[in-house]
Amino acid sequence: MMFYYQVQDEVLVSREALAGVREITEEEASKAQRLIFMSRRVGAGKAAWLVSHKAYLAEAEEGLWCLDSNQQDVLARQVQDVPQWLEEKIAAGGVMGVCADLAQTQELLARKENADKKVVHILAMGDVGSTVLMALALLGGDCVRELGIYDFNERLCQRWEHEINQIAYPWAYDRLPAVRVLTEDQLFQCDVFVFCASKSIPAIGADVQDVRMAQYEANSAIISRYGVLAREAGFQGLFAVVSDPVDQLCCSVWRASNRDAMGNWDGEGLRPEQVQGYGLGVMNSRAAYYAKQDARFQSFLTEGRAYGPHGQQLVIANSVTHYDHALSMELTRLTVEANLEIRALGYKPYIAPAVSSAAISLLLTLRGEWHYSSNFLHGIYMGAKNRSTRNGLELEALPLPPQLLARLEAVAAELEKY
């Protein structure tokens, strides 16, 4: 049974009766421009998301079914009480799901997103951070108003402020976003915070097979501190993780922000969906690079997908509709080892990740377009194709072949260890 309620300008749908709000008829609810579906799994996942399939009304725990339309169809058949008009509203993208109680839901709905160009702040002006800055400055004029930068090295910040602000189109001097040097207490006065800090990157020639995981312990401590600062600032924007290992650091910052001063979990920090990891975009681009060079992989360019972390657990599918396990594993290996080829040439492989994974993917996020990033999924952060909508995060769901699904299950099991 469904209950319908009017709360200010929003219409809520719930399977449980709610006290203290005005109940309305189903006919009245059906006329609403959008609906807010209140899940009974309070605090068990993302606070808000797009209900993109009837399966979400089954209120199952988040999991890989969110990426698999086969499993979604099975779950949807368990939901018997959904009126036709509500199914049509879901198909049109007009239903937001919330995993919160009534008070938290009202607080979420009261937040008004900045509809104008965004303010983006970047932490750390090393190789990666400075490249992200350049790419955002040159490519983001349509959706970024200002770029704030912070680094412990003040001279480094001054250098980049001078350099980037002296790049301009003649007679269109405000076409590109301005760059401003920040103090640490200003870091979270923004719409998007981009974490590019890193304790250390293994030197060229170092005998390290998985460079990204070698950075985990040190970078986890750093990002946890900024999770606490985000909590203290009451930050409501997007916390974008660029440093390696991306997916594991997403978990680190989310957890750190939700513990009190005594280390006890209280859930008062960043919401799961506020944290996104930006590492998968370059792996998709690297797979496309090899697909262009070898006709055996050509199907990837139109039918392929990338999933998971951008490290040893990466999952590349040559095609979802015509999945070939052997080809997919070979293309995955080539993609994972692409950074080692750059290191063998004597260079650190940071330019393509900074632009493909971070800058381009961040801009696609702000524009509400499909891109690759890592998002919260039942306690882990899993990379997949997704987009941000007015009604929450939408994860792409495809009919995943059994062998591909098995690979994703193995990856999820590994990520659960962190």
What kind of region is each of these model predictions?
Residues 175-236:
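Rossmann-like NAD(P)-binding element
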Residues 1-116, 362, 366-369, 408-418:
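N-terminal ligand-binding/catalytic initiation module
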Residues 243-319:
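Rossmann-like dinucleotide-binding core of oxidoreductases
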Residues 152-190:
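Conserved N-terminal Rossmann-fold NAD(P) cofactor-binding segment
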Residues 144-148:
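Short beta-strand element of Class I
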Residues 127-132:
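Hydrophobic/small residue at the entry helix of a nucleotide-binding pocket
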Residues 47, 53-76, 292-418:
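Long, compositionally biased stretches enriched for glycine and/or charged residues
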